[in-house]
């Protein structure tokens, strides 16, 4: 069973481990690089979790004792960040290889969407690398559509992100 944990700054070791695993497993899917974060100290990890108004979520597979106890396995993460004019950003979605196909990504997206609505958001927006078909399919299944606006440059500027959004109204 999958349990979601809303992270606080005290959860920085868990977030660090998940973030490094994501950057190591899927470097093609993120603007940040493993080298950018690999040597970050506790202060840097805590600061990322302390962004005002942000919502950080970890997914854990229950261990034999159940719930998200010490034997639970961290398998995924997602972040929600506040933006201007009612826009909320979905960022850093990742699910580890052993947990893929179990609905973990669906649960993470549903939780960030719940937060976005509860925090007064009118739009949930994301950026994804063109060609990342598993992610694009996931986002479309959750009601996101591609916007005409160009995304930011990706990996040296050769590729631009695909911007997708979903109305929360």
PLM regions and their residue ranges:
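Active-site acidic-Proline motif in GNAT/NAT acetyltransferases
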Residues: 96-98, 102, 130-131
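Acetyl-CoA-dependent GNAT
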Residues: 6-98, 106-111, 115, 150-152, ...
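Residues that form or flank phosphate/diphosphate-binding pockets in enzymes
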Residues: 14, 103, 134
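Short polybasic/polar patches that bind polyanions
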Residues: 100, 117, 140
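Short coil/turn segments at alpha/beta junctions that flank glycine-rich nucleotide-binding fingerprints
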Residues: 86, 102, 118-122
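Extreme N-terminal starter segment of soluble prokaryotic enzymes
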Residues: 1-5
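Conserved amphipathic alpha-helical interaction elements at protein-protein interfaces in regulatory
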Residues: 25, 114-118, 134, 145
């Amino acid at each position: 069973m999958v349990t979601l944990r809303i992270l606080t700054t005290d959860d920085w070791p868990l977030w660090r481990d998940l973030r490094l695993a994501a950057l190591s497993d899927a470097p093609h899917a993120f603007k940040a690089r493993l080298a950018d974060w690999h040597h970050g100290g506790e202060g840097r990890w805590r600061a990322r979790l302390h962004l005002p108004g942000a919502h950080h979520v970890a997914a854990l597979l229950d261990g034999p004792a159940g719930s998200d106890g010490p034997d639970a396995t961290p398998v995924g993460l997602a972040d929600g960040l506040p933006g201007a004019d009612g826009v909320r950003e979905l960022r850093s979605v990742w699910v580890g290889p052993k947990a893929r196909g179990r609905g973990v990504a669906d649960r993470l997206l549903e939780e960030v969407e719940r937060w976005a609505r509860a925090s007064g958001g009118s739009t949930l927006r994301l950026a994804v690398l063109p060609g990342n078909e598993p992610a694009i399919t996931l986002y479309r299944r959750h009601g996101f559509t591609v916007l005409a606006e160009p995304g930011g440059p990706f990996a040296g500027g050769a590729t631009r992100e695909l911007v997708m959004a979903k109305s929360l109204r």
